[in-house]
């Protein structure tokens, strides 16, 4: 879930 959040915030 950390990857999706980071990619979405980027």
Curated annotation (Swiss-Prot):
Tissue expression as described in the entry: Nacreous layer of shell.
Protein name (Swiss-Prot/TrEMBL): Uncharacterized protein SMPP13
């Amino acid at each position: 879930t950390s990857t999706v959040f980071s990619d979405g915030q980027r």
